[in-house]
Structures are given as structure tokens and as C-alpha cells.
């Protein structure tokens, strides 16, 4: 008989409880990247992607759809790094282990207790080291089927850059061209609304591409994040159908379009949108209301044109905007800044622009754009 208060031995515990099957496998980053598109129901799909890096690292970029469960947060990561430099690896790892254990416990309490055994996470950190390894180990000990990505985010980034040209290659692009304010972005969104495949680069970049394209209250993603967003979108397209994209220069604000994509776009069939100047002015007044409503912000953005247009011209535009004549400023921006050289520049950069299908846009309303998009998608002669 067991003495009162004595601890049961391991054998007795196992006899009384269901045996936990520990499943922790590793996977190369390039294979993980391919499997990200597979549904969770797939035998090799993932129920969730868990990023064990700090919130600061996660914000710069992460795997598509990843959740952030930091093993060390920003401050803790700095603390452990400082200890490593000042007192050596052993002292740093003791503190790091305590912090990681506490954080993993919090993540389990917050996110894991309600999950069933079928949950299959992919876990990664910066280089596939202790941060992801610790979290993955505990989750696997619970009984989940855990996959640990070798090499972490660093290896994923390398795999992404290597595979991005392969994702671009099979796609048949349709490039929507037209001067500023012609309705390219509205047409792109209308195409998306009627079921077309669309790559909205300006939407991904949180920028409207032109010198004045900064959107108030929205920060642009990092270059790495922008690349990942594009890479993920490319992987979801059906190469059997066309993908519509707006003509762009190499940079959209502060981020650059990947070279393979830029090259493919510039060699693809073009659609040229033609819109009367007055209609373009009206469209810009509608789509850039923050310039009309905040003349000080408008003037701040106009200062970026001083080197190109001269201080006197920019000052005159600012005075007009501040006196309520924003429409006049918009018209002059089109005529003096955006339009000169547009066709020549586009023809030089987009080799098939001269043979572009021409769309005359006489109505910038949603229903007219929808009809235009439906006609374009169906292959019928589109008309607004």
C-alpha cells in the first residue's frame, strides 16, 4: 500500500492517464513557404503560423498570416543581449530561460487552452534557434503536432526572394495605363469587385505612388513586408486567367517593386484609360479629400516639388490652396507637373503601350466603372 502523502511513481501516473504522443518535426524554409497556401485540413497544412520573435521584429515583416507569440519581447531581448555582452552566455541564458518560460506560459494560458489535438502550428523565430525551439518543444510536449521551421525568418526571406520570379513567370498580366487622375485605381477596384484577379500594388504599399501620394494616417510597410505581401498575392493567383495591375514606376512611395515583377509588367499587354481633364480634376478632388480639407498638409506635400517646379510656382499653388482654390491647383498640377512627358515615359517603359487597348472613360461613377470592368473581363467591347 502506498504511504499517505507519498508521491506516485512515473509508472503509476502513466497507467492512469492517456499517453501523450510527442510530435515535433523540422522543415526547410522553402518547403514551409510552399505549404503556407495549403488549407489546414490538408494532411501537411498548418492550422496556424506562430512567430516567436519580438513584436518589433514581427512588425517589420513576418510570414503571411503569422500570429505573434514573442518568447522575448522588445525590452527582454535587449536585456538578454546586454547580459550576453557584459556577463557571457551562461548568465544571459539563465535570465533568458526564465523570461521565455514565463512568456510561453502566458501564451498557453491566453491562446492554447481551448484548442483541440488537431491543431498543427508552424513555429519560427529569427534563425530557428532557442526562441522558437522552446515554444515548439512545450507545444509538442502537450501533444500538438508541431512543425519547426529551420533557419527561421532569415531562411524564409532567402527562399522568398529565390521563388518570387517563379511566381511571377506564369502569370498573364494586363497593365492598366493612363495619366494621373484618369481612373486607373478605380477601374482596378471595379475589376476586383466583379471577380477579376487584381494585384493592387498601391493598396499593398499604402501609397498612391505619385509625389503627393502619401496617405495621411497610414505608414508604409517595410520593403521586406511589401515583398512578402506581393509574394503571397502572387501565389494565390490562377495562372489560367489574366491578372490586372496598374502601371507603376519602380518605386511606390518609399518601397520598390521587385525586379522580376517590374520586368514582367513592362513587357505585358496594356490597357490605356483616357479621361477628360475636367473629369480627372473632379476624380482627384474626390479621391484626395484630405488635400482639400487640410490646406496646410497640402502645402507641406507640395514642398517636395520645389526642386522640380521652382519655389515661386509652388508658393503660388500654396497660396491658392489656402484661399480655397484647390481645384485650380489640381488642374495646374496635372497640366504643369504630371502630364508633360507622361505618354513618352510610359511608352519608353512599357514596350506594348503603343498597341494598348483604349478605354474612353466618360463617367467616374461606381456603376459606370462596374459596367466597364465587366465588359473588359468578359472580352466584350467595353464602354462607360
Describe these PLM feature segments.
Residues 122, 144-158, 200-205:
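A short glycine-rich beta-strand->turn/loop micro-motif centered on a GG-aromatic cluster
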Residues 131, 174-192:
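Glycine-rich phosphate-binding P-loop
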Residues 136-138, 186-197:
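A conserved segment at the C-terminal end of the G1
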Residues 263-270, 274-384:
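Conserved NTP phosphate-binding and transfer environment spanning the P-loop NTPase/kinase superfamily
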Residues 95-150:
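Catalytic cysteine-centered active loop of the rhodanese-like fold, especially the PTP/DSP P-loop
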Residues 196-263:
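Conserved nucleotide-sensing/catalytic segment adjacent to the nucleotide-binding pocket
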Residues 3-5, 9-64, 92, 161-168, ...:
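Flexible, polar/low-complexity N-terminal or interdomain linker segments that lie immediately upstream
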Residues 41-116:
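Positively charged, proline/Ser/Thr-rich regional signature most characteristic
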Amino acid at each position: 500500500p502506498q504511504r499517505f502523502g507519498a508521491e506516485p511513481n512515473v509508472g503509476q501516473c502513466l497507467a492512469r492517464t492517456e499517453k501523450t504522443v510527442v510530435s515535433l518535426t523540422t522543415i526547410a524554409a522553402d518547403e514551409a513557404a510552399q505549404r503556407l497556401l495549403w488549407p489546414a485540413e490538408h494532411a501537411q497544412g498548418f492550422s496556424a503560423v506562430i512567430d516567436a520573435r519580438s513584436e518589433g521584429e514581427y512588425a517589420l515583416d513576418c510570414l503571411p498570416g503569422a500570429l505573434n507569440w514573442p518568447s522575448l519581447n522588445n525590452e527582454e531581448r535587449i536585456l538578454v543581449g546586454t547580459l550576453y555582452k557584459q556577463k557571457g552566455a551562461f548568465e544571459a541564458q539563465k535570465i533568458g530561460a526564465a523570461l521565455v518560460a514565463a512568456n510561453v506560459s502566458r501564451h498557453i494560458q491566453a491562446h492554447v487552452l481551448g484548442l483541440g489535438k488537431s491543431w498543427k502550428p508552424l513555429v519560427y523565430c529569427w534563425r530557428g534557434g532557442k526562441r522558437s525551439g522552446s515554444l515548439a518543444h512545450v507545444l509538442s510536449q502537450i501533444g500538438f503536432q508541431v512543425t519547426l521551421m529551420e533557419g527561421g525568418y532569415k531562411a524564409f526571406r532567402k527562399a522568398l526572394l529565390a521563388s518570387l520570379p517563379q511566381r511571377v513567370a506564369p502569370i498573364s498580366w494586363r497593365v492598366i495605363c493612363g495619366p494621373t487622375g484618369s481612373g486607373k485605381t478605380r477601374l482596378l477596384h471595379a475589376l476586383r469587385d466583379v471577380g477579376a484577379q487584381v494585384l493592387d500594388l498601391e493598396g499593398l504599399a499604402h501609397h498612391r505612388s505619385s509625389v503627393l501620394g502619401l496617405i495621411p494616417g497610414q505608414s508604409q510597410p517595410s520593403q521586406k513586408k511589401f515583398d512578402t505581401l506581393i509574394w503571397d498575392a502572387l501565389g494565390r493567383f490562377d495562372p489560367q486567367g489574366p491578372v490586372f495591375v496598374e502601371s507603376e514606376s519602380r518605386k511606390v512611395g518609399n518601397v520598390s517593386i521587385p525586379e522580376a515583377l517590374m520586368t514582367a509588367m513592362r513587357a505585358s499587354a496594356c490597357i490605356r484609360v483616357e479621361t477628360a481633364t475636367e473629369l480627372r480634376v473632379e476624380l482627384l478632388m474626390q479621391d484626395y479629400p484630405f488635400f482639400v480639407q487640410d490646406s496646410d498638409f497640402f502645402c507641406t506635400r507640395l514642398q517636395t516639388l520645389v526642386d522640380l517646379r521652382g519655389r515661386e510656382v509652388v508658393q503660388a499653388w500654396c497660396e491658392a490652396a489656402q484661399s480655397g482654390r484647390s481645384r485650380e491647383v489640381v488642374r495646374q498640377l496635372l497640366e504643369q507637373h504630371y502630364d508633360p512627358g507622361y505618354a513618352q515615359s510610359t511608352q519608353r517603359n512599357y514596350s506594348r503601350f503603343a498597341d494598348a487597348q483604349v478605354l474612353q472613360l466618360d463617367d467616374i461613377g461606381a456603376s459606370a466603372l462596374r459596367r466597364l470592368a465587366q465588359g473588359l473581363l468578359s472580352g466584350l467591347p467595353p464602354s462607360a
